[in-house]
Amino acid sequence: MLNQQKVVEIYTDGACSGNPGVGGWGAILRWNGHERELYSGEVQTTNNRMELMAAICALKVLKEACSVDLYTDSVYVRNGISLWLERWKMNNWRTTSKKTVKNIELWKALEDVCSLHTIRWHWVKGHAGHPDNERADALARKAITEYRKNGYFSA
Protein backbone atom coordinates (compact mmCIF):
# COMPACT_ATOMS: atom_id res chain seq x y z
CA MET A 1 0.00 0.00 0.00
CA LEU A 2 1.34 3.43 -0.93
CA ASN A 3 1.88 5.92 1.85
CA GLN A 4 -0.19 8.98 0.94
CA GLN A 5 1.15 12.31 2.19
CA LYS A 6 -1.25 14.97 3.38
CA VAL A 7 -1.54 17.72 0.76
CA VAL A 8 -1.10 21.24 2.16
CA GLU A 9 -1.26 24.65 0.51
CA ILE A 10 0.78 27.39 2.20
CA TYR A 11 0.69 31.09 1.37
CA THR A 12 3.41 33.24 2.95
CA ASP A 13 4.43 36.87 3.08
CA GLY A 14 6.76 39.14 4.99
CA ALA A 15 6.64 42.87 5.65
CA CYS A 16 8.97 45.40 7.19
CA SER A 17 8.39 48.97 8.35
CA GLY A 18 11.74 50.41 7.50
CA ASN A 19 14.31 48.03 6.11
CA PRO A 20 15.72 47.26 8.60
CA GLY A 21 12.97 47.97 11.08
CA VAL A 22 10.02 46.32 12.80
CA GLY A 23 8.94 43.39 10.66
CA GLY A 24 6.21 40.82 10.51
CA TRP A 25 5.45 37.63 8.66
CA GLY A 26 2.19 35.86 7.91
CA ALA A 27 1.20 32.44 6.64
CA ILE A 28 -1.99 30.64 5.73
CA LEU A 29 -2.02 26.84 5.77
CA ARG A 30 -4.86 24.98 4.09
CA TRP A 31 -5.49 21.23 4.03
CA ASN A 32 -8.50 18.95 3.64
CA GLY A 33 -11.02 21.72 4.26
CA HIS A 34 -9.13 23.12 7.26
CA GLU A 35 -7.27 26.39 7.52
CA ARG A 36 -4.81 27.91 9.99
CA GLU A 37 -3.35 31.42 10.13
CA LEU A 38 0.06 32.16 11.64
CA TYR A 39 1.84 35.45 12.17
CA SER A 40 4.57 37.02 14.27
CA GLY A 41 7.58 39.24 13.78
CA GLU A 42 10.85 40.69 14.98
CA VAL A 43 11.79 44.11 16.30
CA GLN A 44 14.87 44.80 14.19
CA THR A 45 14.80 42.87 10.94
CA THR A 46 14.55 43.04 7.15
CA ASN A 47 11.86 42.16 4.65
CA ASN A 48 13.93 39.23 3.35
CA ARG A 49 14.30 37.78 6.86
CA MET A 50 10.54 38.03 7.34
CA GLU A 51 9.89 36.30 4.00
CA LEU A 52 12.17 33.46 5.10
CA MET A 53 10.60 33.27 8.57
CA ALA A 54 7.12 32.97 7.06
CA ALA A 55 8.13 29.87 5.10
CA ILE A 56 10.17 28.35 7.96
CA CYS A 57 7.49 28.82 10.61
CA ALA A 58 4.68 27.61 8.37
CA LEU A 59 6.57 24.42 7.50
CA LYS A 60 7.59 23.85 11.13
CA VAL A 61 3.98 23.52 12.31
CA LEU A 62 3.34 20.54 10.03
CA LYS A 63 3.25 17.47 12.27
CA GLU A 64 4.01 14.90 9.59
CA ALA A 65 5.68 14.70 6.19
CA CYS A 66 3.43 16.48 3.71
CA SER A 67 3.14 17.27 0.04
CA VAL A 68 3.26 21.08 0.06
CA ASP A 69 2.45 23.73 -2.50
CA LEU A 70 4.10 26.83 -1.06
CA TYR A 71 3.20 30.20 -2.57
CA THR A 72 5.42 33.23 -2.00
CA ASP A 73 5.76 36.64 -3.60
CA SER A 74 9.46 36.64 -2.68
CA VAL A 75 11.77 35.98 -5.61
CA TYR A 76 14.58 35.95 -3.01
CA VAL A 77 13.05 32.96 -1.18
CA ARG A 78 11.93 31.06 -4.24
CA ASN A 79 15.22 31.48 -6.12
CA GLY A 80 17.29 30.98 -3.00
CA ILE A 81 15.78 27.61 -2.19
CA SER A 82 15.33 26.47 -5.81
CA LEU A 83 18.41 27.84 -7.58
CA TRP A 84 21.07 29.29 -5.32
CA LEU A 85 21.24 27.15 -2.16
CA GLU A 86 23.28 24.25 -3.51
CA ARG A 87 25.83 26.59 -5.09
CA TRP A 88 26.09 28.62 -1.87
CA LYS A 89 26.83 25.47 0.11
CA MET A 90 29.45 24.28 -2.40
CA ASN A 91 31.09 27.74 -2.21
CA ASN A 92 31.21 27.77 1.62
CA TRP A 93 28.18 30.07 1.85
CA ARG A 94 29.56 32.62 -0.61
CA THR A 95 27.70 34.20 -3.50
CA THR A 96 29.02 34.17 -7.05
CA SER A 97 30.51 37.60 -6.29
CA LYS A 98 32.39 36.04 -3.31
CA LYS A 99 30.31 37.86 -0.68
CA THR A 100 29.01 36.02 2.38
CA VAL A 101 25.41 34.91 1.90
CA LYS A 102 23.02 36.96 4.01
CA ASN A 103 20.72 35.17 6.47
CA ILE A 104 22.75 31.95 6.47
CA GLU A 105 21.12 30.67 9.66
CA LEU A 106 17.66 31.11 8.16
CA TRP A 107 18.63 29.43 4.89
CA LYS A 108 19.96 26.47 6.89
CA ALA A 109 16.75 26.35 8.94
CA LEU A 110 14.64 26.47 5.78
CA GLU A 111 16.68 23.70 4.18
CA ASP A 112 16.28 21.54 7.31
CA VAL A 113 12.51 21.92 7.49
CA CYS A 114 12.15 21.45 3.72
CA SER A 115 13.93 18.10 3.95
CA LEU A 116 10.93 16.70 5.83
CA HIS A 117 8.43 17.42 3.06
CA THR A 118 7.86 17.29 -0.68
CA ILE A 119 7.59 20.95 -1.65
CA ARG A 120 6.60 22.64 -4.88
CA TRP A 121 7.56 26.33 -4.79
CA HIS A 122 5.31 28.84 -6.54
CA TRP A 123 5.87 32.54 -7.09
CA VAL A 124 2.89 34.90 -7.11
CA LYS A 125 3.06 38.58 -7.93
CA GLY A 126 2.76 40.55 -4.70
CA HIS A 127 0.12 43.25 -4.24
CA ALA A 128 -1.60 42.16 -7.43
CA GLY A 129 -4.90 41.04 -5.95
CA HIS A 130 -4.17 37.36 -5.29
CA PRO A 131 -6.57 36.79 -2.37
CA ASP A 132 -4.41 34.41 -0.33
CA ASN A 133 -1.24 36.42 -0.87
CA GLU A 134 -3.13 39.55 0.21
CA ARG A 135 -4.30 37.72 3.35
CA ALA A 136 -0.76 36.60 4.19
CA ASP A 137 0.41 40.19 3.68
CA ALA A 138 -2.35 41.44 5.98
CA LEU A 139 -1.21 38.99 8.67
CA ALA A 140 2.38 40.20 8.33
CA ARG A 141 1.24 43.82 8.68
CA LYS A 142 -0.99 42.83 11.62
CA ALA A 143 2.09 41.56 13.47
CA ILE A 144 3.78 44.94 12.98
CA THR A 145 0.68 46.85 14.09
CA GLU A 146 0.25 44.72 17.21
CA TYR A 147 3.89 45.23 18.16
CA ARG A 148 3.57 49.00 17.78
CA LYS A 149 0.39 49.01 19.86
CA ASN A 150 1.37 46.53 22.59
CA GLY A 151 5.17 46.48 22.58
CA TYR A 152 5.26 42.74 21.88
CA PHE A 153 4.23 40.19 19.26
CA SER A 154 1.11 38.34 20.43
CA ALA A 155 1.16 35.36 18.10
UniProtKB/Swiss-Prot annotation:
Binding positions for Mg(2+) 1 per the UniProt entry: D13, E51, D73
A molecular function GO annotation: nucleic acid binding
Domain RNase H type-1 span(s) in chain numbering: 4-145
InterPro entries, A to Z: RNase_H, RNaseH-like_sf, RNaseH_domain, RNaseH_sf, RNaseHI
Cofactor info, note text: Binds 1 Mg(2+) ion per subunit. May bind a second metal ion at a regulatory site, or after substrate binding.
Domain of life: Bacteria
GO biological process assignments: DNA replication, removal of RNA primer
Keywords: Cytoplasm, Endonuclease, Hydrolase, Magnesium, Metal-binding, Nuclease
UniProt protein name: Ribonuclease H
Taxonomic source organism: Bartonella quintana (strain Toulouse)
